[in-house]
């Protein structure tokens, strides 16, 4: 009897081979090809020994099948070699930067390059390709802010299928780019000289970061964006060099950043999880799909939440709570290997509720002590090519602390709070202690990973549950 799983198993093997090949260097690829030739010869010899026992039709069928498998695998090798060349070109820039190498085994927690004297740092901006000029954006200027919003809205991160794109609202940009200590000089833009059109941007904000047992003065790098039509101009590497130069001139030589792609070299890789709050809309826009044997009515019932939070003492944070809540979070973050160190002023900035931007709730006991905290920021995504829905309103889990209220109760209340301000989905990374509530609260694993990186700092890699850093 024929094996019903033979075709599927073959496909899995091909995918596995292709993945192995894609991860290898070109030298290794040549070995793989050589190995294929050896295996092919061995297969031919084995087939020759069995020829006498097989009818001609079976021989021909086996030959066609073997050739098809060989061609498919050779195509996978060819595609992987092309991918490897592209990756090598992409990594050429990073090979010039103080970052850990992909094959480097790190056991220390230290800077890669020593800090420089200000006199050693390049005084003039880096040279842009012809036809472009540097600008420093003023986010308090309505025109500059609108231009930045438009650039990001039309050219920033979108999903692989080009169905959704982050829609950072102007007031969100001001909140995320103007924390305590922000510098206008770190809001770096690129314009076309003739038209003045904004076609590139990168930003930095000051921060303190704990890496294992050391606290670093760093910047968080974000919103690196180049207009789609200019991505062959190699503008992005110049933007990175220029923001590095400007930050170095202030005496800061380390940075943290995240990316959905793999670069040299992630400190950690986290995965997004999603909890439907408005399942009908999410299915309509193809953000999610109905599970097998599930109707829309059953799906809506599955994700239905109570009308109001249930935890006694659960309420939105107030100005009077700030110092106690700051101490609660400060103590909690010390448990993790990579975490921010917030000053009181920074805590007030990041956790004071702003409608449509950030929301924060605490649980207070009878004596007024703050025992628990939950927070999320609001980041809609534009829906591309849908006749009805133009936006998916997403809540992103920020920082959460549970000391008295069970995790499931606290986060269920957070879901209710987000649903009550018309959020469609609640997203969370599998860092800190978030995994504890994913399954019970009906979160589903997403297909996107987020890599964490440190610039000019090497340290041993970390598991997601050792990470307590959220970058927008």
Curated annotation (Swiss-Prot):
Deletion phenotype, per the entry, is:
Mutant embryos show disrupted actin cytoskeleton and abnormal cell morphology. The range of phenotypes includes head involution failure, dorsal closure, and germ-band retraction, as well as widespread ectopic apoptosis.
UniProt cross-references to SUPFAM superfamilies, sorted A to Z? Acyl-CoA N-acyltransferases (Nat)
Native species: Drosophila melanogaster (Fruit fly)
Question: Which is a Pfam family this sequence falls into?
Answer: NMT_C
Provide one Gene Ontology biological process annotation.
dorsal closure
Instruction: Keywords in alphabetical order, please.
Output: Acyltransferase, Membrane, Transferase
Task: Specify the protein name.
Answer: Glycylpeptide N-tetradecanoyltransferase
Main location class? membrane
Q: Which PANTHER family match?
A: GLYCYLPEPTIDE N-TETRADECANOYLTRANSFERASE (PTHR11377:SF5), N-MYRISTOYL TRANSFERASE (PTHR11377)
Enzyme class, one word? transferase
Q: Which domain of life is it from?
A: Eukaryota
Region spans: Disordered: 1-23, 43-65
Q: How does it sit in the membrane?
A: Peripheral membrane protein
